[in-house]
A protein has these predicted regions:
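Winged helix-turn-helix DNA-binding recognition segment
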Residues: 35-93
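Short recognition helix of helix-turn-helix/winged-helix DNA-binding domains
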Residues: 1-54
Length: 95
């Protein structure tokens, strides 16, 4: 059950947050899945296309918008790198 705690905490945190859409949820869950594949490290380093594939999102514009909003709303800390050879850094915030 401990593996589900970050997801459960996220759903509790967004319960009354009208700003969060299904796309935000999909991206956050994809980030958690990616993190699990990396050994639950915090922060993770990920390329946009890796998270977009997991979240089933086709538009980079949608991805960047939702990542920026998740950062602004305090659910993650997103440090974007515009370098092609380095993934962005994403910190998970304890809810």
């Amino acid at each position: 059950m401990e593996l589900l705690k970050p997801l459960s905490d996220f759903f509790k945190a967004i319960e009354n947050d009208y700003r969060i859409s299904i796309t935000h949820i999909g991206i956050y869950v994809a980030l958690l899945q990616f993190r699990a594949g990396q050994g639950f490290v915090n922060p993770i380093q990920a390329y946009r296309y890796e998270i977009m594939d997991l979240a089933k999102i086709a538009s980079p514009k949608t991805y960047y918008k939702c990542m920026r909003e998740l950062n602004e709303y305090g659910y993650i800390i997103y440090k974007s790198t515009r370098k092609r050879n380095q993934g962005s850094t994403i910190f998970f915030v304890d809810q």
